[in-house]
């Protein structure tokens, strides 16, 4: 695995709205790759890359912005052990965010651009602030693609085939992927660029794939190298084996603004002291459709439920004392 390239990507700090250094690096790096490659930019600053000539192309997308709680220190380093990579500032003696979400996806895109003769890639800006980049995508770029892969999921085994109540791909495409053979299982995911593309009318199958990062959006974010390599090999398998076009249109797209409240309730169970402002800061990138007043309502409902439950326990003990034992 090209860890030198990976750590170079981690070293470029690119918070949402400030991706200029990353764009400059990508343009420079891509133009020195072998083959017939063109790079263009839309009005929003998204990068579109075409390599080779073909009737249809495999297509990969990733986003180039990151979320972190502190800026990179001047001495930021991506440190590597046998198993993992993590961000660290020796001077400040603190862990710092890698940006592996989604620079691991960027890495996979670059490796595939280098390896294959015909491929399309898009690098989106500002995914973390509500998929702003992909909402400005030039959709004609996707007219001749067979499918779209986004490596932008934590862990090592998730194959995102739906988001909310919106399916992203066809059953035929899922069968062609052979996910179980490669250690992946279908899951429902969070809002990301491929959902935005589908909502803009993209008519081919899309998936989001785990790519080996953990603890995203925190300063303790890590990459497990073998899990990233597993993702790269899976993506290469798809490119090489899925040579048909896999059409898919959303039958009844629906995205509930309250669908992921259970996850927020779980976080409140873990730390009941969290405020609506804390939750908004933590989840604004995962659930950009939720506003601050939504978090205020969720906190209010949560605390009311637990207050009622505590009062019930005071009156009724553990809740089982007055029940008859049936034999």
Residue ranges, per PLM feature:
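Active-site metal-coordination/substrate-binding segment of hydrolases
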Residues: 50, 54-118, 128
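Acidic/histidine-rich catalytic neighborhood of metal-dependent amide-processing enzymes
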Residues: 94-172, 182, 186, 193-194
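His/Asp/Glu-rich mid-to-C-terminal helical/loop segments that flank catalytic regions of hydrolases
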Residues: 215-278, 315, 319, 324-327
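Short glycine/proline-enriched coil/turn segments at helix->beta-strand junctions
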Residues: 31-36, 52-57, 112-120, 143-145, ...
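Short secondary-structure junctions
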Residues: 32-41, 78-80, 84, 180-186
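Acidic, low-complexity, intrinsically disordered interaction modules
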Residues: 274-302, 308-309
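Zn-dependent metallopeptidase/amidohydrolase metal-coordination segment
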Residues: 185-231
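A non-catalytic alpha/beta surface segment that caps or lines the substrate-entry region
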Residues: 5-56
